């Protein structure tokens, strides 16, 4: 079984980063693969339904993001329960932000990242019999210190007020 885990580890290490860019190799999965997608609350059984579910996920991702890449952060083997666990990150530029902020030259601050966690369970023949997808959450990038520095400099020079400009009550 250790050999099956090693082979599948190498194949997933090569396949996962290209999931959204190229056609996926579905021979890694058994014919009765179970897909548990906790993000979209989808549960399917069978390779055909798995292919359709992954195609739906790819379709939704490519319609939300204009530029998209998948980064595998960590891929680990667990021989005690015959699983491979992958932490990965989806990085992309949302289409709506691209349309609303088309005038910006530097679009780096518009990119969004989402972290997720997949667990692949292997059967006795070394194929993936269950794929569980969990915990897709936005990753918060640290705020840019340049903006804070610029606002601080403007306040110090008296060009900007630290209080809001909208006053509902007149000052005496």
UniProtKB/Swiss-Prot annotation:
This is Uncharacterized protein C6orf136 homolog. InterPro entries: DUF2358.
